[in-house]
Amino acid sequence: MEERNLRKTRVGVVVSDKMDKTIVVAVRDNVRHPLYNKIVKKTYKLKAHDEKNDAKIGDTVRVMETRPLSKDKRWRLVEIMERAK
């Protein structure tokens, strides 16, 4: 159980739930530009496993790194932090 605590976790917003047991999560990150030293907001998308098809578009969710589940899926849904309004 302690090993699971070392896995990466990310918080993001669900942007797609059209696939069966899969959601697409947009994660926002602040990155410093290497030349201009300006903080730039960067968004990247992850495919995550949603076993019960609980998450809907607009929900804020926490995902955790896991073993490869398919070609693109390397994350799984841990919890739904906030439902979409």
Swiss-Prot record:
CDD domains noted in UniProt: Ribosomal_uS17
Any one GO cellular component localisation term in the record: cytosolic small ribosomal subunit
InterPro entries: NA-bd_OB-fold (IPR012340), Ribosomal_uS17 (IPR000266), Ribosomal_uS17_bact/chlr (IPR019984), Ribosomal_uS17_CS (IPR019979)
Single Gene Ontology BP annotation: translation
Signal peptide coordinates: none
GO MF annotations in UniProt: rRNA binding; structural constituent of ribosome
SUPFAM superfamilies, per the entry: Nucleic acid-binding proteins
Keyword field: Ribonucleoprotein, Ribosomal protein, RNA-binding, rRNA-binding
One Pfam family from the record: Ribosomal_S17
Record PANTHER family: 40S RIBOSOMAL PROTEIN S11 FAMILY MEMBER, SMALL RIBOSOMAL SUBUNIT PROTEIN US17M
Similarity-based family: Belongs to the universal ribosomal protein uS17 family.
Role this protein plays: One of the primary rRNA binding proteins, it binds specifically to the 5'-end of 16S ribosomal RNA.
Oligomer status and interactors: Part of the 30S ribosomal subunit.
Protein name per the record: Small ribosomal subunit protein uS17
Organism of provenance: Agathobacter rectalis (strain ATCC 33656 / DSM 3377 / JCM 17463 / KCTC 5835 / VPI 0990) (Eubacterium rectale)
